Amino acid sequence: CRKSLLQAVANLPYKGGNTLTGMALNFIRQQNFKTQAGMRPRARKIGVLITDGKSQDDVEAPSKKLKDEGVELFAIGIKNADEVELKMIATDPDDTHAYNVADFDSLSKIVDDLTINLCNSVKGPGDLEAPSNLVISERTHRSFRVSWTPPSDSVDRYKVEYYPVSGGKRQEFYVSRLETSTVLKDLKPETEYVVNVYSVVEDEYSEPLKGTEKTLPVPIVSLNIYDIGPTTMRVQWQPVGGATGYTVSYEPVKTTESTKPKEMRVGPTVNDVQLTDLLPSTEYEVTVQAVLHDLTSEPATAREMTLPLPRPQDVKLRDVTHSTMSVFWEPVLGKVRKYVVRYQTPEEDVKEVEVDRSRTSTSLKDLLSQTLYTVSVSAVYDEGESPPVTAQETTRPVPAPTNLRITEVTPESFRGTWDHGASDVSLYRITWAPFGSSDKMETILNGDENTLVFENLNPNTLYEVSVTAIYPDESESDDLTGSERTSPKSGPRNLQVYNATSNSLTVKWDPASGRVQKYRITYQPSRGEGNEQTTTIGGRQNSVVLQKLKPDTPYTITVSSLYPDGEGGRMTGRGKTKPLNTVRNLRVYDPSTSTLNVRWDHAEGNPRQYKLFYAPTAGGSEELVPIPGNTNYAILRNL
């Protein structure tokens, strides 16, 4: 029989033409694997396809029908055959049922393997009844349970065979005849397996009870984030059976920089880690994956936001003025580097002040008056800046000057003095005008001045005065107003005539009020014995010496004050010159044969000259010697 079979195979013709593999598969299904074609009942059905090219018709459907009818297909490709097509035709697993060689001579290289695999498939067909009703349950990512119904006849044991549909090592083990269920372990996650269960009696095997099932994916980790701080958080997950480790990755959800997630790997016994060096007030996405050798589970992802850094508390704004306010806050526990105080108006950019960590207050200066300020205080740490704590306050109106005082009033002027409203006044604007007049005078003073002399005023006129403070932000205070009347024009007072001589009188008076231009002095003998004479002196003087007067004569003297617009007033007094006086106490002494010494007391007044007359008592001519008025002695010689 063996000889005739080999002879029949050797005589098989090699027919050229089209490659219609699908048609050939349909042919053997319809013509060969039939009892009427000579197939023995319960015989193993094995088909071996040998082709040297890619089929021109469909092979998937015909090969599937054959497999569904229990035919075990081997596919052998030579030279131009399509390897993908061969694996599609062949029964799983591919490594024992699909072959591809470069040419016909290379067929010898696969003969041994092919023979073994064919023989293994042929073994034990007989009449042994196979198990039935294959049920696969209790699926996990690493295992599942296989159950079956035993055959009606007793068996010695069961053989369980399994391998991945996609190809891989075929594994098998035996189960006691008393068991009708077993668990396949150490499977690959999310992998479809072929399962064959055989009845075994001695060395005879039944047809396999076939089935397929897919393991579950690696379980998704049950993830929990807790114990969250400003820069840390803890991550915990439910352990996964069979895991060889875990990968924890994390990154901010929103970031301005393109950065890779940070990652840590931990062993299979660790299911709780702390993430450190995180950014405060930042949402993080945390992903945990279980690692099973070269496989990883689907990622379990959660998001959580770190807490903000501790911020100052109880911010208060006090001591508010038109340009300043003080900021107070409660200190922060922790490693604060400094505090930052920011403030702004709705129209201005933010300004900021840095404050040493040892202080909990600061003053804001140069603020705008009557303006709403938003003030915030933040604590700065090595890790970043805390959220701000804010407060609002409106600055006060700029203060006006106070206590306007008018002094030194004259007919043409007076002095105004006031107290500063604040220390930061830039300028003062002062206006004045007669009461009711719209024609106002104005001047500007520096902010450190607080007095002004108002000049060129009209006598006996009520004036209104207004003082306005102007501040650095150009805000103006309310007006400080006052009024004062200038003095009326006046004449001199308290006229005195004194220090009379035989030809002069001294006149003195108290000055008239206001800005006197001149004083006019008129004088003449009281009895009308001479013409009236006039002299003028400057307005700053208040005395004059009238000279070249007549001796022993009473004089009437009038002093008038002269203002720019006329005479202010006058005052009259009287004085009398002294009579002319001769010398007194004339003495002649120290005579000699030709000289005499003469001495006298000065005459009153201011004599310009003395005339000394002398003559012999016995008779003779009289001699005259002129003597200067400041000398009161002479020596008469040549007597």
From Swiss-Prot:
The triple-helical tail is stabilized by disulfide bonds at each end. Prolines at the third position of the tripeptide repeating unit (G-X-Y) are hydroxylated in some or all of the chains. Its main location: secreted. InterPro entries: ECM_Regulatory_Proteins, FN3_dom, FN3_sf, Ig-like_fold, VWF_A, vWFA_dom_sf. Keywords: Cell adhesion, Collagen, Disulfide bond, Extracellular matrix, Glycoprotein, Hydroxylation, Repeat, Secreted. Trimer of identical chains each containing 190 kDa of non-triple-helical sequences. Belongs to the fibril-associated collagens with interrupted helices (FACIT) family. This is Collagen alpha-1(XII) chain.
